Structures are given as C-alpha cells and as structure tokens.
C-alpha cells in the first residue's frame, strides 16, 4: 500500500521533515524519519489520498494538518517522571501559603502552574496530586500540547494499570477504578482480573483506572503550538515546567521559546527545565538557581 501511495510522488522525506519543522518547530532526527514517513502514509491512507495529494491538501485543511501532527508526535511521558521537580513546585506553593499566613495577609492569589508539552497529561495530574496532598486548594494547572489526540487522553484522565505502578503509594488515593458504563457487566460475568494493587480491572477495557474527580476542577488542557507567538492564557504563572521538549528545536528557536515562556512567568516565579537543557541561555530577567537535582530559573524582573 505504501508503494502505491508513494508512486509518482516528487516529494522525499526531507520535504516532510522541513514541513514539520516549519509548522511546529520540531527537528526530527534521522532515526525518526521512517516513523515520519509511516505517519504520512497513515494519514494519506485514512483519507484515501496519495502522498502528493495529501501534500497539496494540507495548506487549506487544518483538520488534516492536525491529524498528521498527531501521527508524527510521540507523546512520551509518565507519572512522577522527575520527582525533584515535582517536590520543588510543591514546596514553593507551600512556602507562598505559609508566608501569607504568617503575615496575616489575605493572599488569595491562585497558584498557577503551566506544563508545556504535557502530552497525555501525566505531569499535570502528578502536580495536581502533589499539591492536593498538601491540602492546597487554590491552584490551577494548565497543560498544553500540539497533539490534540494526546490532549483528548489527558482530559479523559484514564490510564492503563501499568502507569499506576509509577505513582507512589501516598498518592494512590487520587486514583480510582474506571466504572463500566454497561450495567449488565456484573450480571453477564464480564471477564475481570484482580491486579497487584488488589483492584478488579475489566480485561476488555483499555483504561483500568482514572484520576479522582476532585482533581478535575484544578486542571485545564489547551491546544497550543509553543513554536508560535500565540499565548495559551493571559494569566502569569508562578511556575512553568518545560522538560524534555526543547531538545526537538534548533538552538535559536529554543532561545525564542524560552523568551516567550519567561514573559508568561510572574516575577518571583520559576521556570523549570530538564537537567542539562538550555545551558547556553543567559537572560537578563532570569537567574539560575543553584540546585543539585533540577534545572530551575527564577524571574527577577519584568
């Protein structure tokens, strides 16, 4: 099928590689070029187009573009992926709350966190679990990504049981089994098995558990292309987390993205990057915090 779709096609993989970079900034490495062409063929096949017809249709069809992006992007993430970063954000939130309490000020400002490139939402839900576990209530976590398919999963908040194993026991209270919509399932004996966590899971269901409803009011998932000038929100953030995403961009694009992220950060707030990322960055309004485990910058002026 791929050979048929590629027949009489004047485009090669480099055309598609440049197209992806132009649209969303991602510079795909050589090892992902076969994945890229598989995504192109998959998208063309789904719409009964040749690869060349797909190319010609993309400029005027935003839905088709989004489907191609969804097929190309690999949403790699997991719960509690980098615990030192999560702990840092939680401690900062607690510090702000205690300072307001000690001074007697009525600081009811919402504690806002933005997770950039949140994929299917695990980092956002992780942050929500960590803040809620400290009895904090006035916080909002924004998750953004360029993959609408990944965001749909994030909003659903349902994951397979293997991912639950990465959540520390202290936070398991923020998870619960997925309830079946089929009221007859128990009557007809729908196949179930008991996992290592002692909870029965429907083997026919791809989603075995979900985040607790009490967390949903604190999170919001929005489509956003960080490569563009558009802002996902007008609210300044106390913390912005952007980890393991900048590596997909060229250095000069990384610099532009970091500048836009710092503009969205409130004075006194923090920008948390992955260890080793953006070591070339020297902004005048941010200072790097000395920390043994995380790569964090504090905004010191507007």
What is each model feature region?
Residues 120-135:
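Conserved SAM-binding loop of SAM-dependent methyltransferases across substrates and taxa
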Residues 255-267:
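A short glycine-rich, Lys/Arg-flanked "PGG" loop and its adjoining helix->strand segment in the class I
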Residues 139-241, 245, 249, 253, ...:
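Extended basic-aromatic, gly/pro-enriched interface segments that bind polyanionic ligands
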């Amino acid at each position: 099928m791929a050979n048929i779709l590629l027949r009489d096609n004047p485009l090669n993989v480099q055309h598609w590689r440049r197209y992806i970079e132009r649209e969303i900034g991602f510079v795909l490495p050589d090892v992902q070029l076969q994945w890229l062409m598989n995504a192109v063929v998959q998208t063309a096949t789904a719409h009964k187009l040749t690869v060349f017809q797909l190319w010609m249709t993309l400029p005027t069809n935003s839905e088709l573009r989004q489907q191609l992006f969804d097929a190309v992007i690999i949403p790699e993430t997991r719960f509690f992926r980098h615990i030192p970063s999560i702990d840092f954000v939680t401690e900062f939130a607690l510090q702000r709350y205690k300072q307001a309490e000690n001074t007697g000020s009525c600081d009811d400002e919402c504690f806002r966190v933005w997770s950039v490139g949140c994929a299917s939402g695990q980092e956002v839900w992780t942050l929500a679990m960590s803040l809620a576990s400290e009895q904090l209530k006035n916080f909002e976590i924004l998750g953004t990504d360029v993959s609408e398919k990944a965001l749909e999963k994030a909003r659903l908040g349902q994951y397979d049981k293997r991912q639950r194993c990465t959540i520390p026991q202290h936070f398991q209270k923020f998870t619960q089994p997925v309830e079946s919509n089929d009221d007859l399932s128990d009557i007809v004996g729908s196949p179930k098995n008991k996992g290592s966590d002692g909870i029965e899971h429907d083997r026919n269901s791809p989603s075995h558990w979900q985040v607790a409803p009490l967390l949903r009011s604190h999170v919001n998932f929005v489509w956003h292309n960080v490569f563009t000038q558009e802002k996902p929100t007008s609210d300044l953030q106390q913390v912005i987390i952007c980890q393991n995403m900048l590596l997909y961009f060229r250095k000069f694009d990384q610099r532009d993205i970091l500048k836009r992220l710092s503009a969205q950060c409130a004075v006194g707030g923090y920008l948390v990057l992955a260890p080793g990322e953006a070591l070339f960055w020297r902004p005048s309004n941010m200072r790097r915090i000395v920390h043994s485990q995380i790569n964090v910058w504090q905004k010191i002026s507007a």
